[in-house]
């Protein structure tokens, strides 16, 4: 019998990044604009430059990976660094940068897992009446961009199309705190997710028809939804509706190739409450179905869960982007209210810490979508206000958070779920889309004034796990 504290041979112990959150150089070296550029400048709260200065410092970070036993790294390609206008003219400096980055990774034995679009779709697709992926021509543009990358960067063997489609929809059309955002537009949220899933499916088919070596999948932020009172039918319905928004819509599209009848019914109901309709076409379903055999892997980003209770009233959502504990609110018409179950801890940003939820989620994927092939935990970590004292960062709560989640991953593996790797979010401290720089996730502390890196206690702990393949209690 396998030791329950032993990870399988070949398990990937990685660290995760994203282009806009680490690279810096957002308007240099030929890079085109993305919506976040003007949006953040108008806010004036924080800037994505220089972030972690990964554009210039990536050799330092890859060396840290090598020294600390990290054998995989999630990176993303900035679409507008390759195609500054989204389509058309190619920026050779951007192409050269990513070749150099991938070569450095591969030569160090730190295998790159590459995402094509991590929240930074080019601004060009929002001009002249465009609405990003709500405009269907963007689907075709993405597929052409993906095909270029597959053919150009053949040194990459692990591809993901998108990062966190539900989060993109939530920020854009539910919470509305992203560029070009609107609040409580569930109709647009579902439509955006659908169109992006069609783009994913077409890119997956293109990858396999092109005969490229390697694997391809998608990364989703999946979040277990629980009724606050499990024996209350109304609370159970609230949890079900929230699950459709965050999980079932994208999982059905990926692994069914269509939307189950009750999934579509729930989405249509929520779209009608928001005053809109969904445009799901026969050719869209054909595209989803065509990709079914070719979804090689699923990336699961997991941080928290949600407890829901039934409630009547108007929409009221407040995003906690400051770390002022207790300031978040989540009430969505047609769904219900987000609550905290007694005895369950939360972070300063009101994220519920419930590691057992990851086990429930993984078993649910295995049971409900048995045609899945493999899962990577592509993000998991804890945002924390790290204290920097004499060059040492004692982030014991982060270690405990990671240990608990890894233990539940091992239990899921023992239960028959095929999990092939874990990528901690994040490799180094990074720029956060809605929190700036005070919410730190990294294994390596960055002094953003000097860009010097300092390993945290969690980095040494993770090094031991990665190098031994053992999770110690």
Each language-model region and where it sits:
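Active-site region of glycoside hydrolase catalytic domains
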Residues: 2-42, 85-87, 95-473
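Active-site-adjacent substrate/metal-binding segments within catalytic domains
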Residues: 23-98
């Amino acid at each position: 019998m396998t030791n329950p504290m032993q990870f399988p041979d070949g398990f990937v112990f990685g660290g995760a990044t994203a282009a806009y959150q680490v690279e810096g150089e957002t308007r240099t070296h030929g890079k085109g604009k993305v919506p976040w550029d003007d949006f953040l400048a108008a806010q004036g709260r924080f800037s994505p430059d220089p972030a972690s200065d990964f554009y210039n410092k990536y050799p330092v970070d890859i060396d840290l990976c090598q020294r600390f036993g990290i054998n995989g790294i999630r990176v993303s390609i900035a679409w507008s660094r390759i195609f500054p206008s989204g389509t058309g003219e190619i920026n050779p400096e951007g192409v050269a940068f990513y070749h150099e980055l991938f070569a450095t990774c591969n030569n160090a034995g730190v295998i790159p897992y590459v995402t094509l679009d991590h929240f930074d779709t080019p601004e060009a697709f929002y001009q002249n009446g465009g609405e990003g992926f709500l405009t269907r021509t963007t689907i075709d543009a993405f597929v052409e961009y993906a095909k270029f990358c597959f053919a150009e960067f053949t040194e990459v063997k692990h591809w993901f199309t998108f990062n966190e489609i539900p989060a993109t929809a939530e920020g854009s059309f539910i919470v509305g705190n992203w560029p070009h955002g609107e609040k409580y537009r569930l109709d647009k949220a579902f439509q955006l997710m659908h169109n992006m899933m069609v783009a994913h499916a077409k890119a997956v088919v293109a990858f396999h028809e092109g005969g490229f070596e390697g694997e391809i999948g998608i990364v989703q932020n999946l979040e277990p939804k629980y009724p606050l009172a499990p024996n209350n039918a109304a609370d159970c319905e609230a949890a079900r509706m929230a699950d459709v928004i965050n999980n079932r819509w994208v999982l059905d599209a990926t692994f069914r190739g269509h939307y189950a009848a009750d999934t579509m019914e729930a989405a249509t109901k929520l779209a009608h409450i928001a005053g809109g309709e969904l445009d799901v076409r026969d050719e869209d379903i054909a595209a989803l179905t065509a990709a079914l055999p070719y979804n090689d892997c699923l990336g699961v980003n997991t941080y928290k869960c949600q407890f829901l209770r039934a409630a009547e009233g108007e929409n009221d959502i407040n995003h906690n982007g400051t770390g002022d504990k207790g300031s978040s609110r989540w009430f969505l018409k047609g769904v219900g209210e987000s609550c905290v179950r007694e005895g369950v801890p939360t972070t300063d940003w009101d994220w519920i810490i419930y590691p057992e939820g990851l086990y429930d989620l993984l078993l649910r994927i295995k049971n409900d979508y048995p045609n899945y092939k493999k899962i990577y935990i592509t993000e998991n970590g804890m945002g924390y206000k790290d204290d920097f004292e004499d060059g040492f960062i004692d982030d014991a709560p982060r270690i405990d958070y990671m240990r608990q989640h890894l233990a539940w991953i091992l239990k899921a593996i023992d239960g028959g779920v095929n999990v092939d790797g874990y990528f901690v979010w994040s490799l180094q401290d990074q720029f956060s889309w809605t929190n700036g720089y005070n919410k730190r996730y990294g294994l390596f502390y960055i002094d953003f004034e000097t860009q010097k890196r300092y390993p945290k206690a969690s980095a040494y702990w993770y090094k031991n796990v990665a190098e031994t393949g053992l999770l110690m209690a």
